[in-house]
């Protein structure tokens, strides 16, 4: 693996669009927003984004009805088995 195959960044993901959804779907949709945002900014498919449980806990901390307006994640992009993969964890 060369140095160009690895990239790590701290990304702030805005989640305010989750408030446009019904109350019962907000945290679920917020998790989808995180995955879509990272896939777009790291140029990979959504299926290649792996979220750590700390991201899930941060989004669901206030319950299903009230996700945070934004969340900061530390994401790393690297190549595994010839496929680009993004792994993300919560950045405090």
UniProtKB/Swiss-Prot annotation:
**Biological processes, Gene Ontology terms:** translation
Annotated Gene Ontology cellular component terms: ribonucleoprotein complex; ribosome
Q: Which Pfam families match?
A: Ribosomal_L31e (PF01198)
Q: What is the lineage of its organism?
A: Archaea, Methanobacteriati, Methanobacteriota, Stenosarchaea group, Halobacteria
Instruction: Name the chain's protein.
Output: Large ribosomal subunit protein eL31
For this UniProt record, the keywords arranged alphabetically read as follows: Ribonucleoprotein, Ribosomal protein
Which family, according to UniProt?
Belongs to the eukaryotic ribosomal protein eL31 family.
Please give the NCBIfam families that the UniProt record associates with this protein.
PRK01192.1-1
UniProt xrefs under Gene3D superfamilies = 3.10.440.10
- Give GO terms: molecular function aspect only: structural constituent of ribosome
